[in-house]
């Protein structure tokens, strides 16, 4: 009887956790085609849409977010934890994985903790300069920690903490060297996999306000499902070329196209910008631990990006940042060189080799 070589990747919620997990899964299977990768997530996360579409089996458990201000929400999560742990233990017994990798998100904590307690090989991948609470706790129990930012190491415990960079989707990594010169100035905007209302409203207001800044400007804007209809209707009156999308599946195409991006401060967005050498204007998502702000600050300190705090985001401020970059080609060229230093090639393969060694 052939023993299945299962590896489990736990986590999700947003594209910033799911797509790096998929990149790791593909790298594992490339190194050893006999490996079967299973994903564990929750019903509320985007993994329920993305993972099956990518061809991997997905198992769902109960979990939630502890790092919230609402006492009611925190209580709901606390009640889900024992259920999620029991589901995790049962699933681990069924799959008997060679390794369990947590990539962050609701399901990562309980599943990796259960796997560590039982005695399975475990690892966590931390995308942010300031690790989240779950990974700070899990780092004490797991065999290996993989980090994107070197600054994260001082916040984690454990004997094996390795800086590997951000696992970038294979189709994006393959397209890195295909960027081309643009006649117009190309601005790509997105607020993460689910969109950002404040970025959507600010950028659309800035564009519709017209003025010198829209001359020879071309915009591609991923809006997310909640705002797509309303904002794309607004853009019909835009004084420049605008392509609104609900969701962009072929991000590599538009990274090749873009001169600058306006985005949140998730590590995935930063890594993909670094891979293509695109200057980001980052609007960090406010959160309890401000991990996106700390990610953005890492870039700003190295003159590799710009940051606008959400409380300071206005059409005027956004236009000012875009125009200051657009007007100074030498500055842009230097910032492109700087952000490329944040890119570690073949990160997913590095992680896969560490798992399989």
From Swiss-Prot:
Keyword Cell membrane listed: yes
Bilayer topology term: Peripheral membrane protein
EC number from the UniProt entry: 2.4.1.227
GO molecular function, a single term: UDP-N-acetyl-D-glucosamine:N-acetylmuramoyl-L-alanyl-D-glutamyl-meso-2,6-diaminopimelyl-D-alanyl-D-alanine-diphosphoundecaprenol 4-beta-N-acetylglucosaminlytransferase activity
Pathway, per record: Cell wall biogenesis; peptidoglycan biosynthesis
Pfam family, one: Glyco_tran_28_C
Keyword Cell wall biogenesis/degradation found: yes
Gene Ontology terms describing biological process: carbohydrate metabolic process; cell division; cell wall organization; lipid glycosylation; peptidoglycan biosynthetic process; regulation of cell shape
Reaction(s) the record says it catalyses: di-trans,octa-cis-undecaprenyl diphospho-N-acetyl-alpha-D-muramoyl-L-alanyl-D-glutamyl-meso-2,6-diaminopimeloyl-D-alanyl-D-alanine + UDP-N-acetyl-alpha-D-glucosamine = di-trans,octa-cis-undecaprenyl diphospho-[N-acetyl-alpha-D-glucosaminyl-(1->4)]-N-acetyl-alpha-D-muramoyl-L-alanyl-D-glutamyl-meso-2,6-diaminopimeloyl-D-alanyl-D-alanine + UDP + H(+)
Stretches that traverse the bilayer: none
Keywords linked to the UniProt accession: Cell cycle, Cell division, Cell inner membrane, Cell membrane, Cell shape, Cell wall biogenesis/degradation, Glycosyltransferase, Membrane, Peptidoglycan synthesis, Transferase
Binding site for UDP-N-acetyl-alpha-D-glucosamine: 14-16, 128, 169, 193, 248, 292
GO annotations of cellular component type: plasma membrane
Intracellular or extracellular location(s): Cell inner membrane
NCBIfam families, sorted: murG (TIGR01133)
Described function: Cell wall formation. Catalyzes the transfer of a GlcNAc subunit on undecaprenyl-pyrophosphoryl-MurNAc-pentapeptide (lipid intermediate I) to form undecaprenyl-pyrophosphoryl-MurNAc-(pentapeptide)GlcNAc (lipid intermediate II).
Family per similarity comment: Belongs to the glycosyltransferase 28 family. MurG subfamily.
HAMAP family (alphabetical): MurG
Entry protein name: UDP-N-acetylglucosamine--N-acetylmuramyl-(pentapeptide) pyrophosphoryl-undecaprenol N-acetylglucosamine transferase
Gene assigned in the entry: murG
């Amino acid at each position: 009887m052939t023993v299945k070589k299962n590896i489990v990747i736990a986590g999700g919620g947003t594209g910033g956790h799911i797509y790096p997990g998929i990149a790791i899964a593909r790298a594992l299977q490339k190194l050893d085609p006999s490996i079967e990768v299973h994903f564990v997530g929750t019903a509320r996360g985007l993994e329920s849409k993305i993972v099956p579409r990518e061809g991997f089996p997905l198992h769902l458990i109960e979990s939630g977010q502890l790092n919230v201000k609402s006492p009611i929400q925190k209580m709901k999560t606390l009640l889900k934890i024992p259920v999620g742990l029991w589901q995790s233990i049962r699933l681990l017994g069924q799959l008997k994985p060679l390794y369990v990798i947590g990539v962050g998100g609701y399901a990562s904590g309980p599943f990796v903790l259960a796997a560590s307690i039982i005695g399975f090989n475990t690892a966590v991948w931390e995308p942010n300069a300031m690790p989240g609470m779950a990974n700070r706790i899990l780092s004490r129990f797991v065999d290996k920690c993989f980090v994107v930012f070197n600054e994260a190491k001082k916040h984690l415990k454990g004997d094996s903490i390795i800086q590997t960079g951000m696992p970038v989707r294979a189709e994006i990594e393959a397209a890195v060297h295909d960027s081309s010169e643009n006649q117009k100035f190309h601005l790509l905007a997105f607020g993460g996999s689910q969109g950002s209302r404040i970025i959507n409203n600010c950028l659309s207001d800035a564009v519709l306000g017209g003025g010198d800044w829209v001359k020879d400007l071309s915009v591609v804007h991923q809006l997310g499902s909640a705002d797509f209809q309303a904002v794309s209707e607004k853009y019909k009156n835009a004084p420049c070329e605008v392509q609104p999308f609900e969701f962009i599946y072929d991000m590599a195409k538009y990274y090749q196209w873009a001169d600058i991006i306006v985005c949140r401060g998730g590590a995935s967005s930063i890594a993909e910008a670094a891979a293509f050498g695109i200057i980001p204007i980052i609007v960090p998502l406010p959160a309890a631990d401000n991990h996106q702000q700390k990610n953005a600050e890492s870039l700003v300190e190295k003159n590799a990006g710009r940051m606008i705090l959400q409380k300071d985001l206005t059409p005027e401020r956004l236009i000012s940042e875009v125009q200051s970059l657009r007007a100074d080609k030498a500055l842009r060229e230097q910032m492109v060189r700087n952000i490329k230093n944040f890119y570690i090639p073949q990160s997913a393969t590095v992680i896969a080799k560490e798992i399989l060694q």
